[in-house]
Amino acid sequence: MNPNQKIITIGSICMVVGIISLILQIGNIISIWISHSIQTGSQNHTGICNQNIITYKNSTWVNQTYVNISNTNVVAGQDTTSVILTGNSSLCPIRGWAIYSKDNSIRIGSKGDVFVIREPFISCSHLECRTFFLTQGALLNDRHSNGTVKDRSPYRALMSCPVGEAPSPYNSRFESVAWSASACHDGMGWLTIGISGPDNGAVAVLKYNGIITETIKSWRKKILRTQESECACVNGSCFTIMTDGPSNGLASYKIFKIEKGKVTKSIELNAPNSHYEECSCYPDTGKVMCVCRDNWHGSNRPWVSFDQNLDYQIGYICSGVFGDNPRPKDGTGSCGPVYVDGANGVKGFSYRYGNGVWIGRTKSNSSRHGFEMIWDPNGWTETDSKFSVRQDVVAMTDWSGYSGSFVQHPELTGLDCMRPCFWVELIRGRPKENTIWTSGSSISFCGVNSDTVDWSWPDGAELPFTIDK
Protein backbone atom coordinates (compact mmCIF):
# COMPACT_ATOMS: atom_id res chain seq x y z
CA MET A 1 0.00 0.00 0.00
CA ASN A 2 1.54 3.25 -1.15
CA PRO A 3 1.53 6.38 1.03
CA ASN A 4 -1.49 7.92 -0.72
CA GLN A 5 -3.58 4.80 -0.12
CA LYS A 6 -2.54 4.78 3.55
CA ILE A 7 -3.63 8.39 3.94
CA ILE A 8 -6.99 7.70 2.26
CA THR A 9 -7.56 4.59 4.39
CA ILE A 10 -6.70 6.35 7.66
CA GLY A 11 -8.89 9.32 6.69
CA SER A 12 -11.82 7.04 5.87
CA ILE A 13 -11.50 5.21 9.20
CA CYS A 14 -11.41 8.52 11.13
CA MET A 15 -14.46 9.76 9.23
CA VAL A 16 -16.40 6.55 10.03
CA VAL A 17 -15.40 6.76 13.71
CA GLY A 18 -16.45 10.42 13.81
CA ILE A 19 -19.84 9.67 12.22
CA ILE A 20 -20.44 6.80 14.66
CA SER A 21 -19.50 9.06 17.59
CA LEU A 22 -21.88 11.76 16.34
CA ILE A 23 -24.71 9.24 15.99
CA LEU A 24 -24.08 7.98 19.52
CA GLN A 25 -24.14 11.53 20.91
CA ILE A 26 -27.42 12.29 19.11
CA GLY A 27 -28.87 9.01 20.40
CA ASN A 28 -27.78 9.87 23.92
CA ILE A 29 -29.48 13.27 23.73
CA ILE A 30 -32.69 11.70 22.38
CA SER A 31 -32.60 9.05 25.12
CA ILE A 32 -32.24 11.67 27.87
CA TRP A 33 -35.11 13.74 26.42
CA ILE A 34 -37.41 10.70 26.18
CA SER A 35 -36.54 9.63 29.74
CA HIS A 36 -37.27 13.13 31.08
CA SER A 37 -40.58 13.24 29.22
CA ILE A 38 -41.63 9.89 30.66
CA GLN A 39 -40.78 10.97 34.22
CA THR A 40 -42.61 14.27 33.88
CA GLY A 41 -45.65 12.56 32.43
CA SER A 42 -45.59 10.00 35.23
CA GLN A 43 -45.47 12.72 37.90
CA ASN A 44 -48.35 14.58 36.34
CA HIS A 45 -50.33 11.39 36.10
CA THR A 46 -49.61 10.54 39.74
CA GLY A 47 -50.75 13.99 40.84
CA ILE A 48 -54.02 13.59 39.00
CA CYS A 49 -54.57 10.16 40.52
CA ASN A 50 -53.81 11.41 44.04
CA GLN A 51 -56.41 14.12 43.67
CA ASN A 52 -58.97 11.38 43.07
CA ILE A 53 -61.26 13.72 41.15
CA ILE A 54 -64.73 12.34 40.48
CA THR A 55 -67.34 14.31 38.61
CA TYR A 56 -70.91 14.07 39.89
CA LYS A 57 -74.06 15.66 38.58
CA ASN A 58 -74.74 16.85 42.11
CA SER A 59 -72.33 19.03 44.08
CA THR A 60 -69.18 17.62 45.65
CA TRP A 61 -66.79 18.94 48.26
CA VAL A 62 -63.27 18.08 49.30
CA ASN A 63 -62.56 16.99 52.85
CA GLN A 64 -58.90 17.69 53.64
CA THR A 65 -57.22 15.30 56.03
CA TYR A 66 -53.81 16.22 57.44
CA VAL A 67 -51.48 13.32 58.15
CA ASN A 68 -48.51 13.87 60.47
CA ILE A 69 -45.42 12.38 58.77
CA SER A 70 -42.01 13.66 59.93
CA ASN A 71 -43.54 16.98 60.98
CA THR A 72 -44.86 17.53 57.45
CA ASN A 73 -48.49 18.25 56.61
CA VAL A 74 -49.52 15.93 53.79
CA VAL A 75 -52.93 16.67 52.32
CA ALA A 76 -54.85 13.67 51.08
CA GLY A 77 -57.81 14.48 48.83
CA GLN A 78 -61.09 12.76 49.55
CA ASP A 79 -64.15 13.52 47.44
CA THR A 80 -67.54 13.00 49.01
CA THR A 81 -71.03 14.02 48.06
CA SER A 82 -72.54 16.70 50.25
CA VAL A 83 -75.70 16.26 52.28
CA ILE A 84 -77.88 18.62 54.27
CA LEU A 85 -77.94 17.96 58.00
CA THR A 86 -81.66 18.36 58.60
CA GLY A 87 -81.63 18.47 62.39
CA ASN A 88 -85.21 17.19 62.36
CA SER A 89 -84.58 14.14 64.55
CA SER A 90 -85.30 14.00 68.27
CA LEU A 91 -82.59 13.25 70.82
CA CYS A 92 -81.76 9.57 71.22
CA PRO A 93 -83.09 7.91 74.38
CA ILE A 94 -80.15 7.29 76.72
CA ARG A 95 -79.37 5.66 80.08
CA GLY A 96 -75.93 7.13 80.61
CA TRP A 97 -72.74 8.45 79.07
CA ALA A 98 -69.89 6.52 77.44
CA ILE A 99 -66.36 7.93 77.21
CA TYR A 100 -65.73 9.14 73.65
CA SER A 101 -62.33 10.88 73.69
CA LYS A 102 -59.45 12.06 75.88
CA ASP A 103 -56.54 14.01 74.38
CA ASN A 104 -54.04 14.10 77.31
CA SER A 105 -52.57 17.24 75.77
CA ILE A 106 -50.94 18.64 78.94
CA ARG A 107 -49.20 15.33 79.74
CA ILE A 108 -47.97 15.02 76.14
CA GLY A 109 -47.02 18.71 76.06
CA SER A 110 -44.44 18.31 78.81
CA LYS A 111 -42.14 16.77 76.18
CA GLY A 112 -43.85 17.33 72.81
CA ASP A 113 -44.93 20.29 70.70
CA VAL A 114 -48.45 20.96 71.99
CA PHE A 115 -50.35 24.25 71.80
CA VAL A 116 -51.25 26.29 74.87
CA ILE A 117 -55.03 26.42 74.56
CA ARG A 118 -58.28 27.09 76.32
CA GLU A 119 -61.96 26.91 75.40
CA PRO A 120 -61.81 23.60 73.48
CA PHE A 121 -65.05 22.28 71.98
CA ILE A 122 -66.12 19.52 69.62
CA SER A 123 -68.25 19.67 66.48
CA CYS A 124 -69.14 16.95 63.97
CA SER A 125 -69.95 16.87 60.27
CA HIS A 126 -71.59 13.88 58.60
CA LEU A 127 -68.09 12.42 58.14
CA GLU A 128 -65.97 13.27 61.18
CA CYS A 129 -65.77 14.97 64.56
CA ARG A 130 -63.12 17.62 65.22
CA THR A 131 -61.84 19.35 68.32
CA PHE A 132 -61.79 23.14 67.97
CA PHE A 133 -59.76 25.25 70.38
CA LEU A 134 -58.42 28.76 70.98
CA THR A 135 -54.62 28.77 70.94
CA GLN A 136 -52.46 31.38 72.63
CA GLY A 137 -49.90 31.43 69.80
CA ALA A 138 -47.53 29.46 72.01
CA LEU A 139 -46.43 25.94 72.90
CA LEU A 140 -46.41 24.31 76.32
CA ASN A 141 -43.10 24.32 78.19
CA ASP A 142 -41.88 27.29 76.12
CA ARG A 143 -41.15 30.89 77.14
CA HIS A 144 -44.02 32.27 75.04
CA SER A 145 -46.46 30.39 77.27
CA ASN A 146 -45.76 33.01 79.98
CA GLY A 147 -48.83 35.11 80.76
CA THR A 148 -51.32 32.98 78.83
CA VAL A 149 -53.86 33.32 81.63
CA LYS A 150 -55.08 36.37 79.64
CA ASP A 151 -58.34 35.72 77.76
CA ARG A 152 -58.09 38.22 74.90
CA SER A 153 -54.94 38.91 72.89
CA PRO A 154 -54.01 39.38 69.21
CA TYR A 155 -52.11 36.07 69.31
CA ARG A 156 -55.13 33.88 69.91
CA ALA A 157 -56.55 31.83 67.04
CA LEU A 158 -59.26 29.26 66.45
CA MET A 159 -57.74 26.02 65.20
CA SER A 160 -58.97 22.43 64.93
CA CYS A 161 -57.62 18.89 64.92
CA PRO A 162 -59.08 15.36 64.79
CA VAL A 163 -61.02 14.56 67.96
CA GLY A 164 -58.99 12.82 70.66
CA GLU A 165 -55.60 14.07 69.43
CA ALA A 166 -53.38 16.49 71.34
CA PRO A 167 -53.46 19.83 69.45
CA SER A 168 -50.06 20.41 67.88
CA PRO A 169 -48.62 22.34 64.91
CA TYR A 170 -48.46 19.05 63.00
CA ASN A 171 -52.07 17.87 63.16
CA SER A 172 -53.97 21.16 63.46
CA ARG A 173 -55.41 23.47 60.85
CA PHE A 174 -55.94 27.20 61.19
CA GLU A 175 -59.56 28.37 61.16
CA SER A 176 -59.73 32.01 62.25
CA VAL A 177 -57.99 34.69 64.31
CA ALA A 178 -60.12 34.74 67.44
CA TRP A 179 -60.35 35.04 71.20
CA SER A 180 -64.00 33.94 71.16
CA ALA A 181 -65.41 31.48 68.65
CA SER A 182 -67.92 28.94 67.40
CA ALA A 183 -68.05 26.45 64.52
CA CYS A 184 -70.46 23.95 62.97
CA HIS A 185 -71.07 21.94 59.78
CA ASP A 186 -74.29 22.11 57.74
CA GLY A 187 -73.47 18.99 55.71
CA MET A 188 -71.94 21.00 52.87
CA GLY A 189 -69.23 23.01 54.59
CA TRP A 190 -67.73 24.27 57.82
CA LEU A 191 -68.96 27.57 59.23
CA THR A 192 -66.49 29.22 61.60
CA ILE A 193 -67.09 32.36 63.66
CA GLY A 194 -64.03 34.08 65.10
CA ILE A 195 -64.17 37.25 67.20
CA SER A 196 -61.05 39.39 67.59
CA GLY A 197 -60.14 43.01 68.12
CA PRO A 198 -60.30 45.55 70.97
CA ASP A 199 -62.86 45.23 73.76
CA ASN A 200 -64.67 48.37 72.57
CA GLY A 201 -64.87 47.41 68.90
CA ALA A 202 -64.37 43.70 68.28
CA VAL A 203 -65.53 42.13 65.01
CA ALA A 204 -66.84 38.63 64.35
CA VAL A 205 -65.46 37.20 61.09
CA LEU A 206 -67.65 34.55 59.48
CA LYS A 207 -66.02 32.01 57.17
CA TYR A 208 -67.61 29.27 55.08
CA ASN A 209 -65.24 26.53 53.97
CA GLY A 210 -62.35 28.81 54.89
CA ILE A 211 -63.49 31.86 52.87
CA ILE A 212 -64.60 35.08 54.59
CA THR A 213 -68.29 35.61 53.88
CA GLU A 214 -69.43 38.28 56.36
CA THR A 215 -68.45 40.31 59.43
CA ILE A 216 -70.46 41.42 62.47
CA LYS A 217 -69.33 44.51 64.39
CA SER A 218 -69.73 44.89 68.15
CA TRP A 219 -73.00 46.79 68.55
CA ARG A 220 -72.61 47.71 72.25
CA LYS A 221 -68.81 48.12 72.21
CA LYS A 222 -68.50 46.00 75.37
CA ILE A 223 -66.64 42.78 74.50
CA LEU A 224 -68.64 41.09 71.75
CA ARG A 225 -68.51 37.35 72.47
CA THR A 226 -70.09 34.09 71.36
CA GLN A 227 -70.61 30.49 72.41
CA GLU A 228 -67.20 28.78 72.84
CA SER A 229 -68.98 25.66 71.58
CA GLU A 230 -70.63 24.50 68.38
CA CYS A 231 -73.38 26.40 66.62
CA ALA A 232 -76.47 24.42 65.56
CA CYS A 233 -77.53 23.61 61.98
CA VAL A 234 -81.05 22.77 60.78
CA ASN A 235 -82.01 22.22 57.13
CA GLY A 236 -79.00 24.07 55.72
CA SER A 237 -79.19 27.03 58.11
CA CYS A 238 -76.90 27.45 61.10
CA PHE A 239 -77.73 29.39 64.24
CA THR A 240 -75.57 31.07 66.85
CA ILE A 241 -76.01 33.42 69.82
CA MET A 242 -73.77 36.41 70.55
CA THR A 243 -73.57 38.61 73.63
CA ASP A 244 -72.44 42.23 73.87
CA GLY A 245 -72.46 44.15 77.12
CA PRO A 246 -71.61 43.77 80.81
CA SER A 247 -70.73 40.39 82.26
CA ASN A 248 -72.24 41.38 85.62
CA GLY A 249 -75.43 43.09 84.48
CA LEU A 250 -78.02 43.30 81.74
CA ALA A 251 -76.41 42.89 78.31
CA SER A 252 -77.62 42.52 74.73
CA TYR A 253 -78.18 39.05 73.27
CA LYS A 254 -78.77 38.29 69.59
CA ILE A 255 -79.62 35.14 67.64
CA PHE A 256 -78.19 34.95 64.11
CA LYS A 257 -79.46 32.76 61.29
CA ILE A 258 -76.64 32.02 58.83
CA GLU A 259 -76.76 30.30 55.43
CA LYS A 260 -73.47 29.37 53.75
CA GLY A 261 -71.70 31.96 55.85
CA LYS A 262 -74.12 34.84 55.20
CA VAL A 263 -76.41 36.26 57.89
CA THR A 264 -79.98 36.03 56.60
CA LYS A 265 -81.79 37.11 59.77
CA SER A 266 -81.06 38.23 63.32
CA ILE A 267 -83.12 39.12 66.34
CA GLU A 268 -82.36 40.64 69.75
CA LEU A 269 -83.79 38.81 72.75
CA ASN A 270 -86.22 40.66 74.98
CA ALA A 271 -84.90 39.29 78.28
CA PRO A 272 -84.71 42.13 80.83
CA ASN A 273 -84.10 39.87 83.86
CA SER A 274 -81.90 37.25 82.19
CA HIS A 275 -78.24 36.95 81.34
CA TYR A 276 -77.04 34.83 78.41
CA GLU A 277 -73.37 34.05 77.85
CA GLU A 278 -71.44 31.16 76.29
CA CYS A 279 -74.53 29.25 75.20
CA SER A 280 -74.40 25.51 74.47
CA CYS A 281 -76.81 24.88 71.58
CA TYR A 282 -78.14 21.78 69.84
CA PRO A 283 -80.84 20.93 67.26
CA ASP A 284 -83.88 18.94 68.36
CA THR A 285 -86.83 18.06 66.09
CA GLY A 286 -86.21 20.99 63.77
CA LYS A 287 -85.76 23.59 66.50
CA VAL A 288 -82.71 24.80 68.43
CA MET A 289 -82.28 24.64 72.19
CA CYS A 290 -79.56 26.65 73.93
CA VAL A 291 -78.57 26.37 77.60
CA CYS A 292 -76.33 29.21 78.73
CA ARG A 293 -74.35 30.86 81.53
CA ASP A 294 -75.84 33.56 83.75
CA ASN A 295 -72.83 35.52 84.97
CA TRP A 296 -75.03 38.24 86.47
CA HIS A 297 -77.29 36.81 89.14
CA GLY A 298 -78.36 33.19 88.49
CA SER A 299 -76.94 29.95 89.90
CA ASN A 300 -79.28 27.95 87.67
CA ARG A 301 -78.92 28.03 83.89
CA PRO A 302 -81.00 30.17 81.51
CA TRP A 303 -82.28 28.67 78.27
CA VAL A 304 -83.65 29.92 74.98
CA SER A 305 -85.45 27.78 72.41
CA PHE A 306 -86.26 28.99 68.89
CA ASP A 307 -87.47 27.80 65.51
CA GLN A 308 -86.02 28.47 62.07
CA ASN A 309 -87.91 31.79 61.88
CA LEU A 310 -86.27 32.87 65.17
CA ASP A 311 -89.54 32.81 67.09
CA TYR A 312 -88.25 32.11 70.58
CA GLN A 313 -89.10 31.21 74.17
CA ILE A 314 -86.90 31.89 77.20
CA GLY A 315 -86.66 30.65 80.76
CA TYR A 316 -84.45 29.07 83.42
CA ILE A 317 -84.05 25.40 84.29
CA CYS A 318 -86.46 24.98 87.19
CA SER A 319 -84.71 22.12 88.99
CA GLY A 320 -83.38 22.43 92.52
CA VAL A 321 -80.32 20.59 91.20
CA PHE A 322 -78.38 23.73 90.29
CA GLY A 323 -76.04 23.63 87.30
CA ASP A 324 -73.76 26.68 87.54
CA ASN A 325 -70.62 27.33 89.58
CA PRO A 326 -70.55 28.92 92.10
CA ARG A 327 -73.93 27.69 93.39
CA PRO A 328 -75.71 26.95 96.67
CA LYS A 329 -76.44 23.48 97.95
CA ASP A 330 -79.24 21.73 96.05
CA GLY A 331 -82.64 22.74 97.37
CA THR A 332 -85.67 24.51 95.95
CA GLY A 333 -85.22 25.72 92.42
CA SER A 334 -86.95 28.37 90.36
CA CYS A 335 -88.10 28.79 86.77
CA GLY A 336 -86.44 32.20 86.97
CA PRO A 337 -82.99 33.11 88.27
CA VAL A 338 -81.89 31.58 91.59
CA TYR A 339 -80.12 34.55 93.16
CA VAL A 340 -78.20 32.75 95.92
CA ASP A 341 -74.53 32.57 94.86
CA GLY A 342 -75.71 33.76 91.46
CA ALA A 343 -72.83 36.08 90.58
CA ASN A 344 -70.10 34.83 88.24
CA GLY A 345 -70.36 31.42 86.61
CA VAL A 346 -68.88 28.87 84.24
CA LYS A 347 -69.83 27.70 80.77
CA GLY A 348 -72.01 24.59 80.90
CA PHE A 349 -74.88 22.70 79.27
CA SER A 350 -77.97 20.56 79.80
CA TYR A 351 -80.15 18.34 77.59
CA ARG A 352 -83.92 18.56 77.80
CA TYR A 353 -86.06 15.41 77.48
CA GLY A 354 -89.67 16.52 77.85
CA ASN A 355 -90.12 17.50 81.49
CA GLY A 356 -86.81 15.85 82.40
CA VAL A 357 -83.28 17.15 82.05
CA TRP A 358 -79.72 15.83 82.04
CA ILE A 359 -77.66 18.40 83.96
CA GLY A 360 -73.88 18.56 83.60
CA ARG A 361 -72.06 20.35 86.40
CA THR A 362 -68.87 20.56 88.46
CA LYS A 363 -68.93 18.41 91.58
CA SER A 364 -67.72 21.31 93.70
CA ASN A 365 -70.19 24.09 94.52
CA SER A 366 -67.52 26.78 94.68
CA SER A 367 -64.55 25.81 92.48
CA ARG A 368 -63.93 24.20 89.12
CA HIS A 369 -63.31 20.72 90.50
CA GLY A 370 -64.86 17.44 89.44
CA PHE A 371 -67.69 16.79 87.00
CA GLU A 372 -70.92 14.81 87.10
CA MET A 373 -74.03 14.15 85.03
CA ILE A 374 -77.38 14.13 86.81
CA TRP A 375 -80.75 12.96 85.47
CA ASP A 376 -83.67 14.84 87.01
CA PRO A 377 -86.85 13.30 85.54
CA ASN A 378 -88.94 16.44 86.27
CA GLY A 379 -86.21 19.05 86.45
CA TRP A 380 -87.16 21.09 83.41
CA THR A 381 -90.52 22.06 84.89
CA GLU A 382 -90.40 21.23 88.63
CA THR A 383 -88.38 22.95 91.36
CA ASP A 384 -87.55 20.05 93.71
CA SER A 385 -84.04 18.58 93.94
CA LYS A 386 -84.91 14.90 93.55
CA PHE A 387 -82.93 13.08 90.89
CA SER A 388 -82.67 9.43 89.87
CA VAL A 389 -79.24 9.07 88.20
CA ARG A 390 -75.82 10.49 88.97
CA GLN A 391 -72.75 9.55 86.89
CA ASP A 392 -69.30 10.74 87.93
CA VAL A 393 -66.74 11.45 85.20
CA VAL A 394 -64.14 13.62 87.02
CA ALA A 395 -63.41 13.24 90.74
CA MET A 396 -63.87 16.10 93.20
CA THR A 397 -60.09 16.22 93.75
CA ASP A 398 -59.33 16.79 90.04
CA TRP A 399 -59.54 19.98 88.00
CA SER A 400 -62.34 20.63 85.52
CA GLY A 401 -63.52 23.83 83.82
CA TYR A 402 -65.82 24.75 80.97
CA SER A 403 -68.18 22.16 79.50
CA GLY A 404 -70.51 22.14 76.52
CA SER A 405 -72.77 20.08 74.31
CA PHE A 406 -72.32 18.70 70.80
CA VAL A 407 -74.44 16.28 68.79
CA GLN A 408 -73.81 13.55 66.26
CA HIS A 409 -76.36 13.69 63.45
CA PRO A 410 -78.04 10.55 62.04
CA GLU A 411 -76.08 11.16 58.83
CA LEU A 412 -72.91 10.37 60.83
CA THR A 413 -74.07 7.63 63.19
CA GLY A 414 -76.62 5.80 61.04
CA LEU A 415 -79.12 6.04 63.90
CA ASP A 416 -82.63 7.43 63.47
CA CYS A 417 -82.10 9.99 66.24
CA MET A 418 -79.73 12.75 67.32
CA ARG A 419 -77.01 11.44 69.65
CA PRO A 420 -76.31 13.86 72.54
CA CYS A 421 -72.67 14.31 73.58
CA PHE A 422 -70.66 16.66 75.77
CA TRP A 423 -67.07 17.71 76.41
CA VAL A 424 -65.32 18.86 79.58
CA GLU A 425 -62.32 21.18 79.68
CA LEU A 426 -59.68 20.20 82.27
CA ILE A 427 -57.91 23.49 83.07
CA ARG A 428 -54.35 23.43 84.42
CA GLY A 429 -51.85 26.11 85.43
CA ARG A 430 -52.52 29.67 86.51
CA PRO A 431 -54.16 31.14 88.49
CA LYS A 432 -54.56 28.12 90.79
CA GLU A 433 -51.24 26.31 90.19
CA ASN A 434 -47.59 27.37 90.34
CA THR A 435 -46.87 27.79 86.62
CA ILE A 436 -46.27 30.65 84.20
CA TRP A 437 -49.00 29.40 81.82
CA THR A 438 -52.67 28.44 81.64
CA SER A 439 -53.87 25.64 79.36
CA GLY A 440 -56.13 22.61 79.34
CA SER A 441 -56.87 19.17 77.99
CA SER A 442 -60.32 17.76 77.30
CA ILE A 443 -62.49 14.67 77.59
CA SER A 444 -65.80 13.92 75.90
CA PHE A 445 -68.73 11.55 76.32
CA CYS A 446 -71.73 10.50 74.24
CA GLY A 447 -75.13 9.30 75.39
CA VAL A 448 -75.89 5.58 75.05
CA ASN A 449 -78.87 3.41 75.88
CA SER A 450 -76.65 0.71 77.39
CA ASP A 451 -74.30 0.16 80.30
CA THR A 452 -71.93 2.93 81.47
CA VAL A 453 -69.59 3.40 84.44
CA ASP A 454 -68.65 5.90 87.15
CA TRP A 455 -64.96 6.79 87.16
CA SER A 456 -62.58 9.73 86.98
CA TRP A 457 -60.79 10.69 83.75
CA PRO A 458 -58.58 13.56 85.03
CA ASP A 459 -56.01 15.62 83.17
CA GLY A 460 -53.23 13.80 85.00
CA ALA A 461 -50.24 16.04 84.19
CA GLU A 462 -47.54 16.42 86.86
CA LEU A 463 -46.70 20.10 87.40
CA PRO A 464 -44.67 22.28 87.39
CA PHE A 465 -42.91 21.87 84.04
CA THR A 466 -39.25 22.67 83.36
CA ILE A 467 -40.13 26.18 82.14
CA ASP A 468 -41.86 26.90 85.48
CA LYS A 469 -38.85 26.15 87.70
Swiss-Prot record:
A GO term, aspect molecular function: exo-alpha-sialidase activity
Binding-site positions, substrate: 118, 152, 277-278, 293, 368
One Gene Ontology CC term in the entry: virion membrane
PTM comment: N-glycosylated.
Gene3D superfamilies cross-referenced by the UniProt entry: 2.120.10.10
Cofactor annotation: Ca(2+)
CDD domains the UniProt entry points to: Influenza_NA
GO biological process, one term: carbohydrate metabolic process
Activity-regulation annotation: Inhibited by the neuraminidase inhibitors zanamivir (Relenza) and oseltamivir (Tamiflu). These drugs interfere with the release of progeny virus from infected cells and are effective against all influenza strains. Resistance to neuraminidase inhibitors is quite rare.
Region (Involved in apical transport and lipid raft association): 11-33
Residues annotated as catalytic: 151, 402
Glycosylation-annotated residues: 44, 58, 63, 68, 88, 146, 235, 365
Parts of the chain on the Virion surface side: 28-469
Record's protein name: Neuraminidase
Organism expressing this protein natively: Influenza A virus (strain A/Henry/1936 H1N1)
Gene from which the chain derives: NA
